[in-house]
Regions:
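Glycoside hydrolase catalytic-domain context in secreted enzymes
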Residues: 1-187
Length: 188
């Protein structure tokens, strides 16, 4: 099946859903739709430096340490390893009907936030403060996770896109007002 056929098939499937069924698929813990033969799927998995949680996997250095090497090829290679391990875990677990959190093929990785404020407790997840390096390593990791073939090995979901450097405890209500210059210079 090529991309055009896959898109057509997906559109036909969604057309068979009612509004509530379609809306439920937008949550990270999408329920099964038995009448359409769609199994449940949990979109929440992480692979910031290897596949996180749900069993054993290779753990690589944190992204900030990988960035210190300035090696796009190695970062892509680590993404390839993570997606291979993630796919193997997914295949084994889904055959047993285990589709819980941290067991899917959608990885909330990489973290492409530009690390500007050292008070943010998650800076180690990023590629640092340089927008160019963050861009290049983020793209390399995504290429590694998703693969270069006709079909995706896994789905990368870049997170914490812009102006997300904390403080972490207040992230859901902290009201930041960066200047247009700062946004253009460092974030987009």
């Amino acid at each position: 099946m090529n991309r055009a056929e896959a898109k057509q098939k997906a559109q036909a499937l969604v057309a068979q859903m009612d509004v509530l069924e379609a809306a439920a698929q937008l949550s990270y813990d999408a329920p099964a739709l038995d009448r359409l033969h769609i199994p449940e799927y949990n979109w929440w998995n992480e692979a910031l430096h290897g596949v996180a949680r749900a069993g054993v996997a290779t753990s690589f250095p944190q992204a900030i340490a990988m960035a210190a090497a300035f090696d796009q090829d190695e970062v892509q290679h680590l993404g390839e390893i993570a997606s291979t391990e993630g796919r193997a875990k997914y295949n084994a677990l889904s055959q047993k009907g285990d589709r819980d959190i941290y067991k899917g093929l959608t990885f909330w990785s990489p973290n492409i936030n530009v690390f500007r404020d050292p008070r943010w407790g998650r800076g180690h997840e990023t590629y640092g403060e340089d927008p160019y390096l963050t861009t290049q390593l983020g793209l390399a990791y995504i290429r590694g996770l998703q693969g270069q073939g006709e079909y995706l090995k896994a789905a990368a979901c870049a997170k914490h896109f812009a102006v997300h450097s904390g403080p972490e405890a207040e992230r859901h209500h902290f009201d930041v007002h960066p200047s247009k210059k700062e946004i253009g210079r460092a974030h987009v």
